[in-house]
């Protein structure tokens, strides 16, 4: 998942989406992430109504940035992490192929959105000091395994 300053509406512009996608693609290639797998981009706030306009522009920038990073055709598929409203809007507009539904059930559309590929569960602690979230994935979520691991 690519997450920068995705907790604020003002972060989401076409230009930031473009450059985040270029950086994410470079990082993915650097670690050996195979073409055809997904990079998820986070929208980590309760975006609703007018908030979805800059989010849309950000994901249009992502589409262009991933294509540019690969010489014209994107090597990676686009996923989104966010509320049900964000996931639904971006999937319907075909700006995201995969959705990772946030566990923030009070966020817009989250309790009713059913077309998720990954659904975040409740956070819990492991070893008493490392906090992490559980996640449930459906068949195809754009994942991959690195060769030899």
Language-model-derived ranges and their functions:
Residues 1-48, 58:
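Substrate-binding cleft of extracellular glycoside hydrolase catalytic domains
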Residues 45-70:
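Active-site cleft segment of glycoside hydrolase catalytic domains centered on the general acid/base Glu
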Residues 26-33, 63-71:
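Sec-exported extracytoplasmic/periplasmic mature domains
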Residues 15-19, 53, 75-78, 91-96:
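Short linear motifs at secondary-structure transitions and domain/linker junctions
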Residues 87-149:
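Functionally critical loop-and-helix segments that line ligand-binding/catalytic clefts
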Residues 67-88:
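Aromatic-lined carbohydrate-recognition surfaces of secreted/lumenal glycan-active proteins
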Residues 5-6, 45-47, 82-86, 124:
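Active-site-proximal loop/turn and secondary-structure-junction residues that shape catalytic pockets
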Residues 1-2, 37-42, 77-80, 99-101, ...:
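Structural recognition of the beta-strand scaffold that forms the well-ordered cores
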């Amino acid at each position: 998942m690519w997450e920068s300053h995705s907790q604020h509406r003002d972060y989401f512009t076409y230009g930031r989406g473009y450059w985040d996608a270029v950086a994410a693609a470079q990082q993915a290639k650097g670690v050996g992430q195979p073409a055809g797998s997904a990079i998820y981009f986070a929208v980590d706030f309760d975006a609703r109504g007018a908030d979805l306009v800059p989010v849309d522009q950000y994901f249009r920038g992502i589409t262009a940035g991933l294509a540019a990073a690969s010489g014209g055709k994107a090597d990676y598929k686009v996923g989104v992490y966010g509320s049900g409203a964000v996931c639904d809007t971006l999937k319907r507009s075909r700006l995201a192929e995969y959705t990772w539904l946030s566990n923030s059930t009070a966020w817009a559309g989250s309790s009713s959105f059913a077309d998720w590929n990954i659904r975040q569960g409740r956070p819990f602690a492991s070893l008493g000091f490392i906090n992490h979230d559980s996640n449930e994935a459906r068949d195809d979520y754009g994942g991959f395994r690195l060769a030899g691991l």
